[in-house]
């Protein structure tokens, strides 16, 4: 029997008394909401494409225990283990992304998926958490060791990773990674002038992407189009918000999900709006916001730059992806093909988000790993 007393030296007891329970609870609530919404959204999509009604639900429930277990396992680790996990994960992800360029499965004009042991994997999903931690490690190294070119290495890795993402092409993921990297760079001490210059370069890259990639042009033009010329999925998504009103039509009573091809992935927020109303949508927004704010507040109390930068990168990535998904669902920005973390269907997204949140829970634990803080390398 596990002893959970404060005096116990067991790994689990030690974890229990040091992990931030509020952060863990918020993340768990998002996962639970995701399970219910998948039960609502997935069967209609499965029936439409001719597979069993519970096809997507079964697959999601297969990945969910693995993802939650991965998150809890990583949350028990110290700073050294988190850094090593991120570095190894980043290198593996880069290798898989290169393989995807040659042997990937093309979907909607992009080669982002690779089949491994019968499962389709999207390697770029794992770039967000791993690169955020690697960048934090490099930025801290620049400040801690005078001869260590951390900033230069970070810039080189960022440029290389960005090229791989654009070759797929995955403009949405490129935007998220760029925003998080620039945010971390600013927190590490980069002057506001240079941040502005890099931001303007980013805008220039977006304009270039518009002219280089036809699918980017199509999505932007659909976003700017009049109400009558909106894309089919966006029209139906807005209809779902109108149908749901404040309290929703009731669990399983939604009709728009019968017509939206991506109701279980990119547009699952619309299903939530139609069946449970704006109250649940506001609750989901609040949960994501609370995760980001809570992680930021905890990390700011620490004097370790790596913890501050890594927590900022991981939590901001989590929140930004949620904002992009929800905003595109409500036609507040062009669609990006980005999932709602822990809620949308998708094994790659689920595992990658669990990886990121596991590392976030680990680095925001109480001072149990204080002896690890001064040994960055």
Can you say where each PLM-predicted feature lies in the sequence?
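Short, small-residue-rich loop/turn micro-motifs
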Residues: 42, 241, 245, 330
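Hydrophobic alpha-helical transmembrane segments of multi-pass inner membrane proteins, especially
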Residues: 26-32, 36-40, 47-233, 270-328, ...
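Transmembrane helix boundary and interhelical junction motifs in multipass membrane proteins
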Residues: 170-175, 249-253, 263-265, 282, ...
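Glycine/serine-rich anion-binding loops at beta->alpha junctions
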Residues: 117-127, 167-169, 245, 249, ...
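N-terminal membrane topogenic signal
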Residues: 11-27
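Residue-level "hotspot" positions that anchor or transmit function at local structural transition points
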Residues: 17, 259-260, 342, 351
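A juxtamembrane structural motif centered on a specific transmembrane helix
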Residues: 1-5, 11-12, 326-377
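TM-adjacent membrane-interface loops and short helices in multi-pass inner/ER membrane proteins
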Residues: 222-269, 278-280
């Amino acid at each position: 029997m596990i002893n959970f007393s404060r005096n116990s030296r067991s790994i689990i007891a030690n974890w229990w008394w040091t992990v931030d329970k509020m952060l863990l609870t918020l993340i768990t609530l998002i996962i639970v909401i995701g399970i219910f919404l998948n039960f609502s959204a997935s069967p209609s999509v499965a029936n439409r494409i001719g597979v069993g009604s519970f096809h997507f639900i079964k697959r999601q429930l297969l990945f969910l225990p693995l993802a939650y277990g991965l998150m809890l396992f990583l949350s028990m680790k110290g700073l050294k283990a988190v850094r090593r996990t991120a570095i190894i994960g980043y290198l593996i992800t880069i290798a898989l992304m290169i393989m995807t360029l040659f042997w990937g499965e093309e979907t909607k004009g992009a080669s982002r998926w690779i089949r491994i042991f019968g499962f389709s994997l999207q390697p770029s999903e794992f770039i967000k958490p791993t690169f955020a931690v690697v960048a934090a490690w490099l930025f801290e190294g620049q400040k801690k060791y005078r001869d260590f070119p951390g900033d230069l290495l970070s810039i080189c890795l960022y440029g290389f990773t960005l090229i791989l993402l654009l070759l797929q092409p995955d403009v949405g993921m490129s935007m998220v990674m760029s925003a998080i990297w620039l945010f971390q760079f600013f927190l590490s001490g980069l002057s506001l002038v240079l941040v502005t210059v890099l931001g303007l370069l980013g805008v220039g890259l977006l304009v270039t992407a518009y002219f280089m990639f036809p699918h980017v042009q199509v999505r932007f033009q659909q976003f700017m189009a009049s109400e009558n010329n909106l894309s089919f999925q966006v029209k139906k998504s807005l209809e779902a918000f109108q149908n749901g009103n404040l309290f929703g039509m009731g669990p399983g009573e939604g009709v728009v999900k019968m017509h939206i091809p991506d109701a279980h992935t990119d547009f699952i927020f619309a299903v939530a709006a139609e069946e449970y109303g704006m109250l649940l949508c506001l609750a989901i927004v609040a949960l994501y916001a609370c995760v980001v704010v809570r992680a930021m507040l905890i990390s700011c109390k620490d004097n370790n730059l790596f913890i501050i930068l890594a927590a900022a990168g991981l939590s901001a990535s989590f929140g930004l992806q949620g904002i992009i998904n929800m905003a595109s669902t409500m036609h507040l920005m062009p669609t990006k093909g980005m999932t709602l973390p822990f809620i949308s269907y998708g094994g790659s997204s689920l595992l990658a988000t669990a990886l990121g949140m596991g590392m976030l829970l680990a680095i925001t634990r109480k001072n149990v790993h204080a002896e690890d803080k001064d040994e960055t390398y």
